[in-house]
Structure formats: C-alpha cells, structure tokens
Amino acid sequence: MAFSWQEQIKPAGTQDIQCDIEYLDKSYIHVYLDGVETTGYTWTSATNIRLNTALAASTTVLLIRKTEREYLYIEFASGSPFIEVNVDSQNTQFLHLAQELVEGRAIPGFYGTISMNGYRITDLANPINSQDAATKSYVDAADALLGQRIDVEAATRKAADDALSMRTSALENTFISGVETVSYPWSTVLAEATDEVTPGLAFTKAVVEINGVGQIRGYSFEIVDNTILFAKTLPAGTVVAARLGADVTAGDGFATQASVDYLADSLGDLAYLDTAEAVPDATGAGDVVAKLNALLASLRTSGVLAS
C-alpha cells in the first residue's frame, strides 16, 4: 500500500475524485491526468476533488502528495505553542517526507551519476523523448527492424551489383575490351523453332540481334563451344544476326598468328559448308603463310576449291 500517492483509471464522464492520501495541507496534493499535471479542480471536502471539466475519455488519474520540505510546518521558534497537537503535526511532516522519499514519487530528479550496483531497473515504460531510458523489448524491436532494413538494403545492393556485373560482362564481351579482336559478321533466318544456333565459326564473343533488337550476354543469351544459347526458344522465321569474334594478341605485322589461326579454322568450317570461294596461294616464307598454303592444298585435294 502506498502512503504518498494513488493511481486509478477513471471512465469518461468522471468529475469527482476521492483522495485517500493523508496530508497536512491541500496544497501538498498534486493531480495528474494521463501523466500531465492539472490545476483545473477544486476541493469540495477534505477528501473529494472535483475537476472543472468531466473526463472526455478513459483517463489515468494520479494523485501525489508533495510535502513541504524546505520549511517546518510548525515553527516553535516563531511562537507556535509547544503543545501536543503541534508536536504531532511537526512529526507528521517528518513522517510524510520519509514516506515520499521511500516511495520515490516526490523526488524531482537526480543530479549525479546513479549506480544500481548490479541490479536492474524494472517495469519501465517505452521511451518517448530522445533522452528517455529504453527497455530491452524496445531495443530488441528496433534491432529487428534495423536488421530487416539492412537485409532489404543488402538485397537491393546485391541486385544492383548483379546488374552492374552483367552489364560489365556484356561490355567486356563486346569488341572494345582493350585487346585486338578478330570478328566476322553472320546472320541467319531460323527454319524451325530453336533456343540455340551454331554459326560454324570459331568465336568467344558476339554482338547479337534478334529481329534487329540488341541482346545482352548473360541475360538473353550465352556462348558455349562456338554456339549461341538463347534464354528462350525462338520461333521459326526469326532473324538472328551477330558479329562473332575472339580476342587475340597483337603482333608486329598486319596479321597475327592467332588471327590467321582463327581465319584458317573458320575457312575450313566454311569450306565444308560449301560456302568457300577459290583462294590463290599466299606469298612469303613465314610460318603463318605455310599454314595457310597447306590448308589451301588440302581443300584443293578434297575438291572443295577449284583453283
């Protein structure tokens, strides 16, 4: 049982409040409605307080006694008679101050560091102002919310990184990768529905268009073993155009060993597709020229080339 305060939830329409707290003076009793002190009331008796306006809604009504602590209630030195009733009143002031100190309701605040000596502060309300103490449940809820926000941000950033990686990969697989590239234009009209095409050329990269619309490598198509694999099946009649190519290491001349190797491989593939023209022998004594002449000789022997 509390001696210096009382708290009740009063319904809407309440105007009279019963005060069950002992006090020496009515001015020591303070009235709070939902945590806000009010002076809009009058005393109708020693134990009844009437609000100037009835409560509009259910309200927590708190009465707190705050006994005068700076001055003695009875001052014998000022001429108050030293009689039983005055001695009792003075001792009552001391008793009330002790009760208020123990119950803590009248303490206006602390002005120094507080040590709980390892004990907890319990039954706290959730914070409202920026400097209010926070409960564990409030912090846990905020932490969970922050975790959700971090997860969403991480997912968003990953999606952005993946998109950037795809765009970078597509850029690296075009013909501006910083090294010399050999490339071949190629196109076809699909005779039947398919999700892959094999141009018959050696290549490691491609700029691909479907019916004139550019495609993105790693998203709408991929290249595996000189074959273009599409993300979905293309219907018959689709026009597929591409610039096929591969990066090579630049040499000192106009053609590199690697570029002629790719040319030789592709020329051989084209020959067996009956699309090669008669090609004269190359001149010179270099390794590359010898390889090309050997290829031409084999094509003539097989009857693919007429001259």
Swiss-Prot record:
Q: Where in the cell is it found?
A: Virion
The family database entries (InterPro entries) matched by this protein are listed as: Phage_T7_tail_fibre-like_N
Q: Which UniProt keywords apply?
A: Viral tail protein, Virion
Matching Pfam families, A to Z? Phage_T7_tail
Q: Name one GO cellular component term.
A: virus tail
Q: What is its main location?
A: virion
Q: What does this protein do?
A: Anchors indirectly the receptor binding (RBP) protein (depolymerase) to the virion.
Q: What is this protein called?
A: Anchor protein
- Species of origin reads Klebsiella phage KP34
Gene designation? 49
